[in-house]
Amino acid sequence: MSRFWSPFVKDLVPYVPGEQPKLARLVKLNTNENPYGPSPKALEAMRGELNDNLRLYPDPNGDRLKQAVAEYYGVTPAQVFVGNGSDEVLAHIFHGLFQHDAPLLFPDISYSFYPVYCGLYGIAFEQVALDEQFQIRIEDYNKPNAGIIFPNPNAPTGCLMPLQAVEQLLLANRDSVVVVDEAYIDFGGETAISLVDRYDNLLVTQTLSKSRSLAGLRVGLAVGHPDLIEALERIKNSFNSYPLDRAAIVGAAVAFEDREYFEQACRKVIESREVLVGELQAKGFEVLPSAANFIFARHPKQDAGELAARLRKQGVIVRHFKQPRIAQFLRITIGTPEMNQALLDALS
């Protein structure tokens, strides 16, 4: 703490990201990165941007990427917002859409950045308990609110809320913005983007860090009614008019255009997930149903924190959350078959 800090900074409780180990020999199954590389076409497109044009500012609107997203999902570019990772997109959403008198609602088990944003922007919030199966009860959100946000599939549980239930939540909250955070939707769910033309209060966020293997590039997006998108553009242009560099815009656009590679990579992750679930269940683990590129598992005879520490000593990193209701679970990223086998060998 410095004497130069403002009182505001002193009271901030920042987000704690997953560990990024420096030792290459570790099997990294803790931050939900894709074990398969980006689209080769996207890599080639980015290499093409490494020229004298880097002396010029990038397109502040990211129109090439907006067009690619719009074509992929069957919406218009005016319904698309892009930013420097979905975390930045979410920050703009909190800043521009959730600062009202009533509290923001989100699940008690969800992305731990949500309360951080609330602290940063002075947003009152209420964490609504998931049911015993870690699912949202729609009736629990039938109360005055400044908005609703939830991850689908849930992070960190991986549990999926069906699209029909998402629509029921929208119908029950027509006067509030409902944000569906779809960081992991491509690994087993149905996107709510198909609903944006019917619900002007719906905003869907996604990232290219997971299913499109571009975590190191930092690209995120939101899709919704043009009025909601305009609010995000106003916040963006009051903060950073050039959030995406030239290579990121082109590489992300091509990642959307290369559907064949994207579908192949997702399919491999899903197949590996189902194999790993079976292997862990055979070892006595309870594994929650997952529609993500990770699983949430616990063992009735093992303390999760101690197990995570022992796995690390054997060169395998998984994520443990010291949080009520889930303190005995481990979140395990789906790796390549070889990475998953290393986990199983360590458990043995």
UniProtKB/Swiss-Prot annotation:
Keyword annotations: Amino-acid biosynthesis, Aminotransferase, Histidine biosynthesis, Pyridoxal phosphate, Transferase
EC number: 2.6.1.9
Needed cofactors: pyridoxal 5'-phosphate
Enzymatic reactions: L-histidinol phosphate + 2-oxoglutarate = 3-(imidazol-4-yl)-2-oxopropyl phosphate + L-glutamate
Molecular function per GO: histidinol-phosphate transaminase activity; pyridoxal phosphate binding
HAMAP family reported in the protein's UniProt record: HisC_aminotrans_2 (MF_01023)
The protein's name in its UniProt record: Histidinol-phosphate aminotransferase
Source organism of the structure: Pseudomonas putida (strain GB-1)
